[in-house]
């Protein structure tokens, strides 16, 4: 915990799972609205994460769109959307993930909570599919025969076409969490849909 520099100790001592060493989501309890956590989040995969796994403490269920965030120690919120919080579990490497919100908030959000509970924390394969530091990143990670794809962006809305050639010739069933039509006003707005991929 804290700002200890990751120095490769997890290679020498495999029982060391991850280090914080990051301006994680807990900072949103007291950070001024001038802090741009969303921009920070699309930079650290290219900088901090290169040196190893990190404890960011993602998973906020109270999500504020741009301009609606304010620091609140007793009921903290994230900047950005709910789907962004879910995608961070794929984009950020963290073998020992923490949950940043309260149990009652997770109980009120069973669909998001179920996704967080099911996502692996160690991976068999990881591929960065697309990205530009400070703007966006899309990462695919595989555990067994199951692939997870997560993408985050800065405050700019964008559509990204994902090249699914990494799936090979197999057929898959996809579950997609995506920002809802009102996510730019209410960060908690999202839609979950399922469809086949061939």
Can you name each region flagged by the protein language model?
Residues 106-112, 155-158, 165-173, 177-183:
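Active/binding-pocket-proximal capping segment
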Residues 65-92, 97-98, 142-147, 152-158:
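Long hydrophobic segments that form regular secondary structure
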Residues 133-172:
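Carbohydrate-binding surface patches
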Residues 176-197:
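Solvent-exposed beta-strand/loop surfaces of large extracellular or lumenal domains
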Residues 83-129:
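Catalytic cores of secreted or luminal carbohydrate-active enzymes
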Residues 1-77:
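Aromatic- and carboxylate-enriched substrate-binding clefts and catalytic-loop regions
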Residues 3-4, 24, 61, 96-98, ...:
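Short, glycine-/Ser/Thr-/acidic-enriched flexible segments
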Residues 1-3, 21, 58, 102-103, ...:
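Active-site proximal loops enriched in glycine and acidic residues that flank catalytic Cys/His/Asp
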């Amino acid at each position: 915990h804290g700002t200890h520099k990751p120095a490769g100790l997890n290679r020498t001592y495999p029982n060391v799972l991850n280090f914080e060493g990051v301006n994680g989501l807990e900072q949103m309890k007291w950070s001024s609205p001038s802090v741009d956590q969303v921009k920070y989040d699309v930079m650290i995969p290219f900088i901090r994460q290169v040196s190893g796994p990190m404890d960011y403490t993602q998973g906020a269920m109270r999500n504020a769109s741009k301009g609606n965030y304010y620091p609140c120690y007793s009921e903290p919120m994230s900047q950005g959307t709910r789907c962004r919080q879910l995608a961070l579990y794929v984009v950020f490497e963290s073998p020992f993930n923490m949950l940043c919100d309260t149990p009652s908030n997770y109980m009120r959000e069973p669909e998001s909570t179920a996704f967080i509970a099911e996502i692996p924390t160690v991976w068999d394969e990881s591929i960065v599919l697309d990205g530009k530091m400070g703007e966006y990143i899309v990462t695919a990670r595989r555990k067994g025969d199951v692939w997870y794809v997560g993408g985050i962006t800065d405050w700019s809305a964008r559509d990204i076409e994902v090249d699914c050639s990494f799936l090979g010739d197999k057929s898959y069933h996809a579950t997609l969490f995506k920002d809802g039509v009102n996510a730019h006003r209410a960060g908690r707005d999202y839609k979950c849909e399922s469809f086949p991929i061939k």
